[in-house]
Amino acid sequence: KDGDEYVINGRKWWSSGVMDPRCKVAIVMGKSNPDAARHQQQSQILVPMDTPGVEIVRHLPVFGFDDAPHGHSEVKLDNVRVPAENLFLGEGRGFEIAQGRLGPGRIHHCMRAIGVAERTLEKMAKRLLSREAFGRPIAEHSVWEERISKARIEIECSRLLTMKAAYMMDTVGNKVARAEIAMIKVKAPRTLLDIIDDAIQAHGGGGVTTDFGLGRACLLYTSDAADD
């Protein structure tokens, strides 16, 4: 901090939407006091994108998919000065703000993953009924009946765990529900990835093209952080 301003230096990957021409303001989280208690070192502040020292370095494709000008980018902040009044809630409350978003954000991605898993299962079933191998539809080969059944079971398990996590977040709060949130963050994306893998097998060579959208669906697997 310098007087009534904060001077920001750093580099940030995965800055969401900053290349979109409609993006005029960024919310920046950074370390404001390294000597404070562990969870009070970070702060969040509003930074207008036209502030001197703000540089969009590059767009970041994910698994080769390029969503520019949307998606994510790398941003460099070089002696960026912003008024102290732009600070959210107060100095040292950045982690607190972030935690209020992470739980709901993660369960939101799990809901999306379940929806994509349903759509992927539909594509797989349609493909299995329309494609033939050894003189009969692939769906008639026993291994695919087992895979379809397993996919349905896993989707329902993921849906129920997501609903339980959401119920607990509403009734007892995110802190008490943190175990359920963590569990569904692991379960839903892994369920999706398993179903996508089977769907790619069902589509043959077409499964690895962009024609069926299966590769893009894989991007949800690591949404909002890794699951390990």
Predicted regions and their residues:
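Flexible, small-/acidic-enriched active-site or ligand-binding loops
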Residues: P52-N79
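Short, charged, solvent-exposed linker or helix-capping segments at domain edges/interfaces
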Residues: H39, E55-R58, A84-E91
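Structural alpha/beta core scaffold segments of enzyme domains
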Residues: K1-D2
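Short, solvent-exposed loop/turn segments at the edges of secondary structure
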Residues: P21-C23, Q40, H70-H72, G213, ...
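Alpha-helical interface subdomain recognition
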Residues: E5-Y6, E74-V80, G90-F95, Q99-S223
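Short alpha-helix boundary/capping segments
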Residues: V18-P21, A37, F65-P69, L102, ...
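A short, hydrophobic C-terminal helix/tail in secreted or cell-surface proteins
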Residues: D224-D228
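A short core secondary-structure module
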Residues: E5, N9-V57
